[in-house]
Every structure is written in C-alpha cells, then in structure tokens.
Amino acid sequence: MEHLPEQYRQLFPTLQTHTMLASCSQSALAEPVSRAIQDYYDSLLYKGTNWKEAIEKTEFARNEFAKLIGAEPDEVAIVPSVSDALVSVASSLTAFGKKHVVYTDMDFPAVPHVWQAHSDYTVSVIPSIDGVLPLEQYETHISDETVLTCVPHVHYRDGYVQDIKAIAEISQRKGSLLFVDAYQSAGHIPIDVKEWGVDMLAAGTRKYLLGIPGVAFLYVRKELADALKPKASAWFGRESGFDGAYAKVARRFQTGTPAFISVYAAAAALSLLNHIGVSHIRDHVKTICADAVQYAAEKGLQLAAAQGGIQPGMVAIRDERASETAGLLKKKKVICAPRENVIRLAPHFYNTKEEMRHAIDEIAAKTIHK
C-alpha cells in the first residue's frame, strides 16, 4: 500500500501543528478514536447506562486484537496493563512445580519489578552482548528447571527486534513457557503467535496501538490455559461471573470491570490498524527509518542502534542530555521520546520521511551547539 501518510494524515488533527514521533511512548490520537471516547461519554450522559453496549465493545476489541496477532478470541484476556498481565501470569505457575524464571536485561523495568516481588522464584537475568541478545544466550541461560522465560519483542530503548520464533523453539525444547512483551511492536510489526509458537504475549494500547492508557491484552495459548490457575483473578475471570469456576482459556486472567472508556478507544484504534494492515505499516515505517538513519549519520549524529536488529522501527540518537533536548524540541512542536541517554524517534504509518528529517535537523542543531 503506497502513500500511507497521504491517505491517513487527515485522521490525526495534531499533525496539522506538530511533528509526532513518539509512538514508542504515546501515538497521535486519531479522530475515530476520539469519537469512540466521546461515544462512551455520550452513552452515559444521554442514556444513563451503557453496560450492554460496553460489553459488546469489549468483545469487539478482543476480536480485533486476536485478528492482529493471529489468535482466537478466547485466547485473549482484557487486562488493565502489561504489568498486570505479568503479575497474573506470575501467580498462575504453581502447577508446573518449577521455580526458575529468566528475563533479559533488555526487558522494560516493570518485568524485573514483578519478579523481585516473588521471592519464591529463583530469577536469572540473560545479559545482552554489545546491544544484542544472541540466541546462544538463551541456550545458555534457559534450563530444564526454567518454568518461564520473559522476553521483549522490541527493546524499548533502541528498537532492537528479536527473533521470537527462534527463541520460542529454544524455550520449548528446554521445557520453559515463553512470555513475550509486545508493547513496543504490536501495531507496527506483524505478529503471528501461532506461527511463532508463543505461549503468552501481552501488549498495551497507548503506544503503536493508537489507544490510551487503561487497557491491555494478554494472549494465552489455548492448549496451555487449563494448567494455569491465576491467583490474580476475579469475577470477569470466572465462567459465569458469580461462581468460583475459572473461565475457559485466557479469560481466567481477567479481574474486575475493565476501563470501558479505554476499551472503546482500543476498539476503534484496532479496527483502523487492521483495516490498514500491519504489514503495510511495517514496510512504511521501515522505509522512513532507513532514510532517517542515513540522514542522521550525514548530520554527524551518533546512533544507538544495536547491530543485528531485524527490522528497525525506531531511530535512537545518542544524547547525554536527552530529556533536555526533547524539551527544547517540544517547544518547536517536535514530539519525540527521550529515554536515558537517547532520543527516540518512533514514527507510525501517518509520518513522512520529511518529518523524520526535520526532527533530525532540530536535534543536530540542539546537540552540536550545546
């Protein structure tokens, strides 16, 4: 699908005044998503109650996310956040009789926070080597005593993409379950949980999924679900809502009433993404990022990209005062996402090559003259 930005930019009013390149943190808000949020308000303001409509919207969002990742709807749970998803997963593993968990030093900090709170597990960290995680590291650190391996699909700091299918093969061979944090990939990199052999995968909606905070999705492979008994479960995770039996498949990981306003937003956002097609989005983002990498190098900027990434969807530029630089850019209506000592430019399907170059020009002007 050619000319993606031209087709869809009018859906994003912010683009008329701002250069929005922070999809790794918060994407631009699309008018269909804004209308969905307003629909939620209006349903309460003018109808007084909206329970049936909200439940229908929840199921629609579940179906759209399942379509996005190649899953069945019953394999998807609606949860408040990726952190909540992992907390629930961590509480569900007792039946496996193993107490060793591994995660990587590229995981978002919420992942180690969860496992630090579970003193009954022995935890190991898989270290990266020169900014990459070779498959040999997984071979070394996953053992037959490992109950769960946690990995990010995309590194939040520099956009490094991992080969999840290859990691899944290693974890399965060693008898470990695999949990994938897809918050930084869902919406701009195609995901196929069945083809990859993933056991569990979670993603929130405020980044590349075009939504707002308050809702996330947890995929659980249906053949696995019955063996998982989450202690973090409540009435939305029960078969009827009012008895003690776990719901079938992934729904058992649900807790209370979801944030319906965020569900409305997610339903509209996911529908838009599925209409466009993530493979088209991937191709567009990859093209403009490749141009931006070359342009940044020409401008004398130092890139933080790791060697060996599969398909770049982010341009990370080194800057020891990244937050300060990002603040200066914000004054010029260029919105990017600083993290530690890098400035992240994270485009989406609505961005152009010219916007990426404009942001790089502004970064070069700020960093070179500091």
UniProtKB/Swiss-Prot annotation:
Transmembrane segments: none annotated. It holds the Pfam family Aminotran_5. GO terms for molecular function: transaminase activity. The modification N6-(pyridoxal phosphate)lysine is found at K207. PROSITE patterns: AA_TRANSFER_CLASS_5. It comes from the Bacteria. Its EC number is 2.6.1.-. Keywords: Aminotransferase, Pyridoxal phosphate, Transferase. Belongs to the class-V pyridoxal-phosphate-dependent aminotransferase family. This is Uncharacterized aminotransferase YcbU. It comes from Bacillus subtilis (strain 168). The gene is ycbU.
